[in-house]
Amino acid sequence: MIAVLRMLNRGRSRAERVRARLVAAGAAVATFLVCTAVSLADYKDEGGSLTGLGLALLAVPIGGLVHQANRLASATRERRLAALRLAGATPGDVRRLGAMEGGSLAVGGSLGGGALYVVTHLAGPLPQVPVVVALVTLGGVLSGARAGRHVVASPLGVARRARVRGPRVRDLLLLAAGVGLFVLGAVKKGDFPLAGPYGSAVSVAAGLVLLLFGVTLTTTWMIRGYARWAGRRARSAEALLAARLVEADPRAWARALAVVSLTVFFGAAAGAQQAGVGYSQGHALLDVALLVALATSAVALVVHQAEELIDLRRSFAALAASGVPERALGGVLVRQAVIAALPVCVVAAVSGVAVVVLTLTDVYQVQWLGWAVARAVAMAGVGVLAAVLVALAARPLLRGALVFETRA
């Protein structure tokens, strides 16, 4: 199995090599940030806790960027795995090869990030380093094992045309568990029942991870429902087409907007907290982390737009050939972004304020709600604006897809 993996690595394309470097670098940066965030759990002051939370938040968009890097050359990887299946490899062999490939990249990057943390924190706590390295490596193994899930079912590509999976009721449980762990760790802090401050940090980190997946799965409900509502009330062909396209595949939009929704959620929650305690250096670092998360989510949206244009290029080319102007097709992209992002950002902003207010019900004052609501509205607007700007920036991709399909 190792010999086969080495042979496949020697035959990797340039896109595959770029993807491998991005995955390893992302694993290294995520390991360093999480180790640093856990080490700050020892500080009793509010600034240290907020700094640790900001660093933990920085690891979330980096994880999303690693996921998008895995998607950059997914078609090439699936062709290689499909060739192995046709050559006689079993589904288990394909899964093991994918797990070994993803695990090797993750363990190399996480060891590099752990070594960097040890060098820069010789006097700081070190017990969390092997735990974080193991968790990051495990994530790489699971991601690699899932890479060939299409070709395991059908090496000829039949599974790629399967019906898009819709939202499920059990997706809500994941979101509830994430909110519960995050609130528990944030409220208890140093008095956490298990392992004290380290247990609190682990609870917050686990809550963030579950929130990331829970928001991705749960927002599918909101996006599909709002798209259906917008389609029934559409007053133009552009709005109707955009609503129907979003309704046809809400999970893809939920996946692309996951980091955006988390950015809006934590931005609104931070604003609700600032209204009571004032603005500190820890809040400044938290805002920087949110800006980085928003920029990273914009990259994820660009990748999503490119993938969608590749899938819909024939339909768009047929519309263009029938006389629909390119500007109108670009308007469809913008309307899609608004339909998908608006409900997600609004619900995320309201949820962020609600979590803080409900957690601090005994001490929270009514006059603080003014700043909290203003910050929530601003964060929701920034999230929708980011999606719209990405859609406007994707118009050259639309033009290229139309030209390519016309020549073909």
Give the residues covered by each predicted segment.
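Transmembrane-helix bundle segments that line or gate the permeation/cavity pathway
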Residues: 27-45, 53-76, 91-124, 128, ...
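Perimembrane helix-loop junctions in membrane proteins
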Residues: 72, 151-157, 228, 232, ...
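C-terminal membrane-exit region of the final transmembrane helix in multipass inner-membrane proteins
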Residues: 133-162, 384-408
